[in-house]
Amino acid sequence: MFILEKPYVSELLKDTLNKMGKPILDNAVARGAFKASPTPIYTESDFVEAYNKDRTQPVYSNSENTIDWIDNNLDSGDLPRKIRLFKDKGAFRDLVRDMYPDFFYRTVKLEKLDSINAGELPIPCVIKPCVGFFSLGVHMVESIAGWQEAINAIKNEVEQIKTMYPAKVLELDNFIIEECIEGEEFAVDAYFDAEGNPVILNILGHLFASSDDVSDRCYITSTEIINKHHDDFQSLLQEIGKRAELKNFPIHIEVRTDGRGNLGVIEINPCVLRAGV
């Protein structure tokens, strides 16, 4: 089952869905993408009915903008809970707390940020929305003085950012403060199959311009990168999938490795099957 949303539906995705003939939710984006195609589009009620007949079947999307619709319409199954587990960075940290017993993180309300004593934080650290998207609202803090600068920047950004994405994609009431994870960063697209086994689709090295760069601009990959890291990342995904009971579930995970077998998960984004679409 597929739900299409802005910002982009690629030609490859349209061609693939034309060949598959799987249910596609009727909305403005789907009608625009398939206006000259015989591909069937399901009304909301028919789509929900098809999902309820088999709640274990995969639901894929090209955009996190679909999360709000899923939360409101597919709530008879377990999908919204699993999406929320990974969209909420605080909930995810709780899930893997014993995997990283010495890792510092703290969740805090937006209005309470001014009351945080920066001297009690593991500087450098990062502060970001608990439910975030791309690098919006994310700030590196490299000194105690830089803490207040980050808080001031967040306050200035909040109202502007709220107009950009649905609330389920980006929530700015709660933030999480985390210690910085050192090492080389990678982005991994994967999915869990019907038996709960993780299948890695790609591994991308994430390059940054500087230590305080948090952008998503530059990624690289190669046979060497994939061969070097595949098995370690596979084992990590198996453990996370077991804890979250994931089946027929696509994810995008960002992870850092220190080159000595120690892996630190930055975050996991759910539901969107990015690779090749």
Q: Model segments located where?
A:
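ATP-dependent carboxylate/phosphate-activation module, predominantly the ATP-grasp catalytic core
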Residues: 182, 189-243, 269-277
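Conserved N-proximal alpha/beta basic substrate-recognition cap immediately N-terminal to
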Residues: 30-120, 133
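Conserved ATP-binding module of the ATP-grasp superfamily
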Residues: 102-104, 144-182, 239-243
